[in-house]
């Protein structure tokens, strides 16, 4: 039974914002997405890091990567195209330079890792097993598979295999971040669930491009890139809803979240937590603003806890099909 709504602005008792993502426990559902928050240090002048539900720092790889040629980012009418190419200093530098600061920031650190193949994911997970300050791993499985020439995240069996491989070397909670650039997101999420993931993060960016028609040139050095921001929110919501309807695995929703209303849409659709991404570039204090507004929004629904509203979307009753010829006859 759904909680009884209350008028906006009405007083409410304290709301429980705690989140469980499999074995990962978070104090609240507001996380910041990989690649949009640096390694946390860059945002200390804007956000009290310790108040966040979690920080997902920039993705790391086994060895340093220089990333793609410029231009790497292009602003669009309703978002941002990026083609960074996983530019990072590698895991050794991360452990030496970045993790000590993150460990002391007060928020759970969910380390984002990416490999060119399953072996590299396993290698990274093994290195991070037992490292103080690492709360969980997020697998960025939208990177090219060198061995097979396809994306690991677009094949359900490869997704299952990568997650299972990681699961075999670590007891850390594992989140699988999935690409929307597939025909059946549920099948990929099922692969992650069967592999042993604690949760899935939905979604990564959508493929897109931008063109300078006067110069007849692409605006990104890599030609195509990943689209993020408000333009992809409807796609992200659809993916969250579809996975929630079919699977029991917890979901972290991400894609175009700019306001508390956006967060609430994801919660009702089935996400247990959210990640803020592109909004961090436009409004570095957004995570604080949104987190502060969630209790009142939950109060409007009469909810005593976040869990009371997750996955409570009320679907319309299915209507019986009507013969098209009969419908046409009535239309005249």
Give the location of each predicted region.
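N-terminal capping/small domains of soluble enzymes
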Residues: 1-109, 115
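Alpha-helical scaffold segments in soluble metabolic enzymes
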Residues: 45, 93, 123, 161, ...
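Short gly/pro/ser/thr-enriched loop/turn and capping motifs at secondary-structure boundaries
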Residues: 61-66, 144-146, 207-210, 281-283
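Short low-complexity, flexible loop/linker segments enriched in glycine and/or proline
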Residues: 70-72, 215-218, 289-292
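Alpha/beta enzyme core
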Residues: 116-252, 258-269, 276
């Amino acid at each position: 039974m759904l909680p009884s709504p209350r008028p906006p602005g009405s007083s409410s008792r304290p709301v429980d914002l705690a989140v469980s993502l499999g074995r990962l426990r978070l104090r609240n559902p507001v996380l910041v997405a990989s690649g949009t928050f640096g390694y946390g240090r860059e945002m200390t002048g804007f956000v009290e890091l310790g108040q966040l539900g979690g920080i997902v720092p920039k993705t790391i790889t086994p060895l340093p990567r220089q990333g793609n040629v410029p231009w790497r980012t292009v602003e669009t009418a309703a978002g941002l195209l990026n083609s960074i190419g996983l530019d990072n200093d590698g895991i050794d530098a991360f452990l030496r330079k970045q993790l000590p600061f993150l460990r002391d920031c007060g928020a759970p650190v969910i380390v984002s890792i990416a490999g060119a193949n399953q072996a590299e994911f396993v290698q990274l997970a093994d290195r991070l097993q037992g490292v103080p300050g690492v709360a969980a791993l997020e697998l960025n499985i939208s990177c090219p598979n060198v061995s097979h020439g396809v994306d690991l995240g677009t094949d359900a069996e490869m997704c299952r295999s990568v997650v299972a491989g990681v699961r075999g070397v670590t007891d850390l909670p594992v989140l699988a971040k999935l690409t929307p650039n597939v025909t059946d997101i549920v099948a990929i999420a099922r692969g992650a669930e069967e592999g042993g993931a604690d949760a899935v993060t939905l979604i990564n960016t959508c493929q897109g491009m931008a063109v300078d028609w006067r110069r007849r040139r692409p605006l990104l050095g890599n030609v195509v890139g990943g689209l993020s921001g408000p333009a992809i929110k409807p796609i992200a919501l659809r993916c969250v809803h579809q996975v929630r309807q079919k699977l029991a695995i917890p979901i972290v929703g991400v894609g175009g979240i700019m306001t508390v209303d956006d967060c609430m849409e994801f919660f009702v659709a089935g996400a247990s937590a959210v990640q803020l991404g592109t909004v961090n570039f436009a409004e570095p204090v957004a995570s604080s603003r949104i987190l502060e507004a969630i209790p009142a929004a939950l109060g409007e629904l009469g909810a005593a806890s976040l869990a009371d509203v997750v996955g409570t979307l009320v679907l319309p009753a299915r209507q019986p099909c009507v013969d098209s010829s009969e419908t046409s006859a009535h239309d005249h």
